C-alpha cells in the first residue's frame, strides 16, 4: 500500500510552494552571499551513458559548425545542460551529510558527550554547520535557476532539515559537554520545527519571523562552536554567573552550568513564544473556516506521545539511557520525528483532509514494549527482562527502517507521478 492516493497525485501536479522569510539578517547579509554561492554549483553533471558520450563527441567534432552558427550552439547547449543538470536534492543531501559527519566526529571524540573534544573538533562542528546552512539555502536557488522546483524538492529539503535537528543536537552536545541534556537540546529544536510545519499545513505558507531558527538560530550555534574552539568546552561546564558575569546577579541561573542555563533561556525566549504564535495562527485559520480546533490539535498528538514516551522510558530505565547512550536515544527519536514531519508534509503536499493520520502512530510502536521492559526491572531487583542496550538498539533500528521505507517509497511514488528523477533533471521517458 502506497502513501499517495489518486487525489494526492492530482494535487502534486498543481502544487506550488509558498514561503516568506522576514529575517533582516537573511535579507541583507546571507541572501547576497547565498546568491553568489549558487554560481559555484555547476549546471552540468557528467553521465556515463552512451547518449552522453555521443553528445560530447558530437560537440567536439562540430565545434566549427557551432562557431559559424551561434544560434545552433545556444540551442544545443541549452538542451544538453538541462539534461545533465544535477537536481537541487543532491545539494540538499550533501548539506545534510555535513551534519552527519559532524555528529560522527562528536561520537568519536566524546562518546557520552560529557567530556571536551579537541578544539579543532569544535571548529569543524561550526564549519560543517555553516556549510549545511549554506547548502540548505542554495538548493532552492538552484531549483529556481534550473526551473526544477517540485513538491519532491520541498519534501526532500524539509525532511533533511527534520533529521538535521538530531544530528546537530549531537554536535552541539559534543561542543558544550551537554551529556544527558543533549536530548533536551534536540527537543528545543524539534518542537518549533514540528509546530512550524503544522502551521504551514493550515496556512499553506511557511512564514519565518524576523528572528528565526534557520537563520539566526543556526548562526548563533555555529558561532558558539567557533567560540568554543577558542575558549575551550570547559566554559560551558562552569557556573553561568562565572561564564557571564553581567548576569551573575540573577538568582538560580547564576549557579547552574552554563549549558543548562542556555537551554532554559532558549525555552523561555525562543521555544515558548514561537509555539504560541504557531498555535495562534492556526486557530485564526481554523476559526475563519469554521473547522474544528481539536481536530487540528490531534495532528500534534503523535509528536507529544513520542516525546512523552521517550521521557517516561528514560525515567523508568535502570540504565540511565540518556546519560549512557545519548547518540542512540537522539538518533532513534530523531528518525521517528523525521517520519512524523515527513508524513505531515506529505499530507500538505497532497491536500489530505485535516486531522490525525493514523499511520503516523507507526513511529510509536516500539515505545510500549520499551517502557514495559523498563518496568520489569522494578519487579526483578533492578534488572530488566531484556538488556536495555539491545532494546534501545532495536528501537533505533526500527526508526531507521521506518524512515527509510517512508522516504524511498514516497520518492518513488512522487517521481513516478511527476515523471522526474530525484537527483537528476531530466524527464522520464513515458
PLM segments and residue spans:
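C-terminal membrane-associated helical module and adjoining short loops/tails
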Residues: 1-44, 48-49, 56-85, 189-430
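Residue-level recognition of pore/gate-forming positions within transmembrane alpha-helices
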Residues: 58, 96-99, 161, 225
Amino acid at each position: 500500500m502506497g502513501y499517495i492516493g489518486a487525489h494526492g497525485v492530482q494535487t502534486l501536479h498543481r502544487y506550488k510552494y509558498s514561503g516568506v522569510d522576514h529575517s533582516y539578517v537573511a535579507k541583507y547579509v546571507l541572501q547576497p552571499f547565498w546568491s553568489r554561492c549558487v554560481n559555484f554549483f555547476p549546471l552540468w553533471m557528467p553521465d556515463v551513458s552512451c547518449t552522453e558520450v555521443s553528445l560530447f563527441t558530437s560537440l567536439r567534432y562540430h565545434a566549427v559548425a557551432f562557431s559559424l552558427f551561434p544560434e545552433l550552439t545556444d540551442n544545443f547547449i541549452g538542451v544538453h545542460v538541462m539534461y545533465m543538470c544535477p537536481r537541487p536534492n543532491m545539494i540538499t543531501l550533501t548539506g545534510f551529510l555535513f551534519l552527519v559527519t559532524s555528529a560522527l566526529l562528536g561520537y568519536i571524540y566524546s562518546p557520552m558527550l560529557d567530556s571536551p573534544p579537541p578544539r579543532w573538533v569544535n571548529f569543524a562542528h561550526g564549519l560543517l554547520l555553516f556549510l549545511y546552512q549554506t547548502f540548505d539555502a542554495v538548493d532552492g536557488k538552484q531549483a529556481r535557476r534550473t526551473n526544477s522546483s517540485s513538491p519532491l524538492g520541498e519534501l526532500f529539503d524539509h525532511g533533511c532539515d527534520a533529521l538535521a535537528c538530531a544530528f546537530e543536537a549531537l554536535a552541539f552536545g559534543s561542543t558544550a559537554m551537554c551529556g544527558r541534556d543533549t536530548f533536551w537540546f534536540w527537543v528545543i529544536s524539534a518542537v518549533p520545527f514540528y509546530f512550524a510545519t503544522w502551521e504551514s499545513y493550515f496556512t499553506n505558507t511557511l512564514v519565518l519571523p524576523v528572528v528565526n531558527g534557520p537563520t539566526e538560530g543556526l548562526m548563533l550555534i555555529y558561532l558558539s562552536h567557533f567560540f568554543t574552539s577558542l575558549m575551550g568546552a570547559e566554559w560551558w561546564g562552569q557556573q553561568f554567573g562565572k561564564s557571564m558575569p553581567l548576569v551573575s546577579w540573577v538568582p538560580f541561573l547564576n549557579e547552574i552550568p552554563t549549558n543548562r542555563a542556555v537551554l532554559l533561556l532558549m525555552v523561555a525566549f525562543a521555544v515558548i513564544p514561537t509555539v504560541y504564535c504557531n498555535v495562534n495562527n492556526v486557530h485564526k485559520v481554523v476559526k475563519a473556516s469554521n473547522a474544528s480546533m481539536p481536530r487540528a490539535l490531534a495532528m500534534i498528538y503523535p509528536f507529544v506521545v513520542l516525546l512523552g514516551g521517550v521521557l517516561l522510558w528514560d525515567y523508568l530505565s535502570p540504565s540511565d539511557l540518556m546519560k549512557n547512550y545519548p547518540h542512540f536515544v537522539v538518533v532513534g527519536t530523531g528518525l521517528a520525528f523525521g517520519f512524523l514531519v515527513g508524513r505531515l508534509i506529505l499530507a500538505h503536499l497532497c491536500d489530505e483532509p485535516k486531522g490525525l493520520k493514523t499511520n503516523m502512530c507507526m513511529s510509536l510502536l516500539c515505545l510500549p514494549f520499551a517502557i514495559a521492559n523498563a518496568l520489569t526491572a522494578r519487579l526483578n531487583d533492578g534488572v530488566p527482562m531484556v538488556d536495555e542496550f539491545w532494546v534501545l538498539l532495536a528501537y533505533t533500528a526500527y526508526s531507521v527502517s521506518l524512515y527509510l521505507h517512508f522516504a524511498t517509497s514516497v520518492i518513488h511514488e512522487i517521481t513516478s507521478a511527476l515523471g522526474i528523477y530525484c537527483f537528476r533533471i531530466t524527464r522520464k521517458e513515458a
